[in-house]
Amino acid sequence: MKKLAISIGDINGIGLEILVRSHEELSKICTPFYFIHESLLDKASKLLNLKLFNAKIVAFKDGKDYEFNFVKKENSLEIYSFYLPLDFKVDENFEIKAGEIDTKSGLYGFLSFKAASYFVYEKHAHALLTLPIHKKAWEDAGLKYKGHTDALRDFFKKNAIMMLGCKELFVGLFSEHIPLAKVSKKITFKNLSIFLKDFYKETHFKKMGLLGFNPHAGDYGVIGGEEEKIMEKAIAFVNAFLHSKKDEKFFKKALKDENLQKELLLNFKGKGVYLPHPLVADTAFTKTGLKNCNRLVAMYHDLALAPLKALYFDKSINVSLNLPIIRVSVDHGTAFDKAYKNAKINTKSYFEAAKFAINLHSKA
């Protein structure tokens, strides 16, 4: 079976309860390695009145050699150690504060995530599944990252792409956790062309559409000009480049050379993988709109995620593309209001994420 490295997220939220409640079923489809120390797992288990049996847990420690070792078997748990450069002291001896933003739980969740990421990178597991973190807890802990995807870019020096959804609808985000006021400045021919090229090469979706940035997709330039001045040009260029089968070196050269762009367009005949014009966002998510195209790109976060979660909240997942590792996540937050209350918690997104990672690795 495929091996999944699972980071615990913010332990003050619902992540650990999802992990414990789902372990038996999850173990039927993969071999999970949970990145949590035994002492902290014991505290959480007592609060939840739930016990984790027949599981593998990894105690992550600061070190230089990425060494992975079996330590012992105790109370049906297989305990391992994994050493990596962490830049922070690992503190597992803190109190769990259910439903609260806390610097210690924020930092611990980050270190669990970093260790699990490199565990996969070092080929000890096939994919990474992350449970939800709290961004404010990360910030209060002195971390510079806005979330998992932002951190993965830094870890691996790659331009990670965030994609969310399910088989009925997937959406790639051109911009993620940045203020709305900064999005328009990010939309340039170069930035968008690189994104569209990379998004296709990671997904190989056969038909994709870009959601317009402005209301009514700009109404032929009446409302803003990004659609006609930038987006349509980037779409045409990327469609022509993908059709040409030329290499990455040519792409980088053509980005700066209008004559090469014109040459590509002259030689391009037929349909591209991207629809030629941006879609009007307020109708793209209707039944008719999704029947036409259900693989979309959004210029900013809420343009896509508000309708996606309204339609498919329970089954949507988060996928990080364009990285040297496979990373998936649940598409929901820490749910502090439900943490450690034995509330009814939906685990569908968790299982969908695990299945997606397993299938993606099988196709790789």
UniProtKB/Swiss-Prot annotation:
GO cellular component terms listed in the entry, alphabetical order: cytoplasm
Record keywords, A-Z: Cobalt, Cytoplasm, Magnesium, Metal-binding, NAD, NADP, Oxidoreductase, Pyridoxine biosynthesis, Zinc
Top-level taxon of origin: Bacteria
BP-aspect Gene Ontology terms: pyridoxal phosphate biosynthetic process; pyridoxine biosynthetic process
Primary location: cytoplasm
Annotated metabolic or biological route of this protein: Cofactor biosynthesis; pyridoxine 5'-phosphate biosynthesis; pyridoxine 5'-phosphate from D-erythrose 4-phosphate: step 4/5
Positions of substrate binding: 148-149, 309, 318, 327
InterPro entries the record matches: PdxA_epsilonprot (IPR037539), PdxA_fam (IPR005255)
Molecular function GO terms recorded: 4-hydroxythreonine-4-phosphate dehydrogenase activity; cobalt ion binding; magnesium ion binding; NAD binding; zinc ion binding
Cofactors demanded by this protein: Zn(2+); Mg(2+); Co(2+)
Listed Gene3D superfamilies: Isopropylmalate Dehydrogenase (3.40.718.10)
A Pfam family that the UniProt record links to this protein: PdxA
Cellular location(s): Cytoplasm
E.C. no: 1.1.1.262
Reaction equations catalysed: 4-(phosphooxy)-L-threonine + NAD(+) = 3-amino-2-oxopropyl phosphate + CO2 + NADH
Binding site for a divalent metal cation: 177, 216, 301
Anything else known: The active site is located at the dimer interface.
PANTHER family: 4-HYDROXYTHREONINE-4-PHOSPHATE DEHYDROGENASE (PTHR30004), D-THREONATE 4-PHOSPHATE DEHYDROGENASE (PTHR30004:SF6)
Similarity comment: Belongs to the PdxA family.
HAMAP family: PdxA_Epsilonprot
Function according to Swiss-Prot or TrEMBL: Catalyzes the NAD(P)-dependent oxidation of 4-(phosphooxy)-L-threonine (HTP) into 2-amino-3-oxo-4-(phosphooxy)butyric acid which spontaneously decarboxylates to form 3-amino-2-oxopropyl phosphate (AHAP).
NCBIfam families reported in the protein's UniProt record: PRK03946.1
Assembly notes: Homodimer.
Protein name, per record: 4-hydroxythreonine-4-phosphate dehydrogenase
Organism annotation: Campylobacter jejuni (strain RM1221)
Phylogenetic lineage: Bacteria, Pseudomonadati, Campylobacterota, Epsilonproteobacteria, Campylobacterales
Gene behind the chain: pdxA
